[in-house]
Amino acid sequence: MAKDILFDVRAREAILRGVNILADAVKVTLGPKGRNVVIEKSFGSPTITKDGVTVAKEIELENKFENMGAQMVKEVASKTSDVAGDGTTTATVLAQAIFREGAKLVAAGHNPMDIKRGIDKAVGAIVAELKKLAKPTKDKKEIAQVGTISANGDETIGTIIADAMEKVGKEGVITVEEAKGLETTLDVVEGMQFDRGYLSPYFVTDPERMEAALNDALILINEKKISSMKDLLPILEQVARAGKPLLIIAEDIEGEALATLVVNKIRGVLNVCAVKAPGFGDRRKAMLEDIATLTGGRMIAEDLGIKLDTITLQDLGRAKRITVDKDNTTIVDGAGGQQEIEARVKQIRAQIEETSSDYDREKLQERLAKLVGGVAVINVGAATETEMKEKKARVEDALNATRAAVEEGVVPGGGVAYIRCLKALDGLQLSGGEKFGVDIIRRAVEEPLRQIVGNGGLEGSVVVNKVKESSGPFGFNAATGTYEDLLAAGVIDPAKVSRTALQNAASVSSLMLTTEAMVAERPKEEKDLPAGGGMGGMGGMGGMGGMGM
């Protein structure tokens, strides 16, 4: 298959055209006065969004060379979204500015490798300055402010996220679900919850709510199936003598064993409830060990040399309260030792650091939350499906931004933090053409502020100069159109988001600047189909004989 190849200036011009098309579509969404973008869907209603990465992901260009440029900037937005969860539009604006300025210098004959080194030095200096500028998030109010800004000024979302974080802690899991009604609400589940319900409705103790409630209960955690009553009998007799309720968690409980438990429950001999173990395969084993650690019991597993018919009450876990409905089991206030729980938490944290799979990381994070905090669910309500999709995306963005703020602190928002970091570029030791790379960054970091102001219908240059002349957190609040102390006004960005956006934008733009050739497949030429031939003549329809009337 023959390929098309572009060299030198023509290659960079094609990249720039692609970068501009994508960035111009994305950057209209930046800031409190940013506009919406409507995206056609192959089925259902179109999506209306103000989320940069959602817009970027939808863009594919017809020209293959321009499309390569667009895809590289899309990578900037996606990577920023993956790492920091927000800041995708800022990253796109920065990438466009860095590449546009750099392409002019390379076209004028400057060495792109010198420029790249200058860009790297400048970004390193600004990132170090951002870290100095960042202040830790102290209270719920600041977390709510970060959430509000990331949710495009929606205070209810900011407040709900701050409430959720306060209730489940930094390590807690916060999930976003679609609500049935119009209201956006917060549900918090304390303790350890997993998605398995009772194996028989006969275990229910509260018929009105259809749930089994066990107070001050014992917990039997078994890795394998239980089908024979013979194995269970010894421990059941001990539990009956102790007069305490019992929860049995096993891979499955069936046949004779389940029937006997149900009969004993109905007769009032034993207050018992049986549920299947959560998860599958190795993850199931790990989750059962988590439950054992949390409740101070042992997991009954044959590979550990523990048999079901030899265990005593000492091997069972304990919890103050257990609630089981048809879908979920919640264990509150387990009797596990604090040291053992902390050791388990440390182990899970180490696994989170090591894993490269996003799915595994998410599941490990959930296990961690169940051990240390709890789980909060934000139910997003809206009037229509289109509004629901848009609002849910905003809540997820805001949630990611608040997590980033808790992690690395906050800096003044509205593009001001970058301008306050410019002083870090003055003392850099530079050689040769590196100065041009630093100048590119010096100009590029003004771009987010210019764009925020431009989207608000004002002149960017005037505002940039006024902000440069001042110091500290003083800047332009685009939501109100006033100059003020942005930290006091609650216009703040997570330092992690600002840092990641600049690093990713500079990384990809530098690569594009040092591109000397581009190779793409030639578009296939559609051959004109020959005109369709007429239908062959239909043979004569033999004489039909005289049709007498």
From Swiss-Prot:
It is an enzyme of class 5 (isomerase). ATP binds at residues 29-32, 50, 86-90, 414, 477-479, 493. Its EC number is 5.6.1.7. One of its GO terms (molecular function) is isomerase activity. It catalyses: ATP + H2O + a folded polypeptide = ADP + phosphate + an unfolded polypeptide. The keyword Chaperone applies. One of its GO terms (biological process) is protein refolding. PROSITE patterns: CHAPERONINS_CPN60. Its main location: cytoplasm. Keywords: ATP-binding, Chaperone, Cytoplasm, Isomerase, Nucleotide-binding. It is found in: Cytoplasm. HAMAP family: CH60 (MF_00600). PANTHER family: 60 KDA HEAT SHOCK PROTEIN, MITOCHONDRIAL. Belongs to the chaperonin (HSP60) family. This is Chaperonin GroEL 2. It comes from Myxococcus xanthus (strain DK1622). The lineage of its organism: Bacteria, Pseudomonadati, Myxococcota, Myxococcia, Myxococcales. The gene is groEL2.
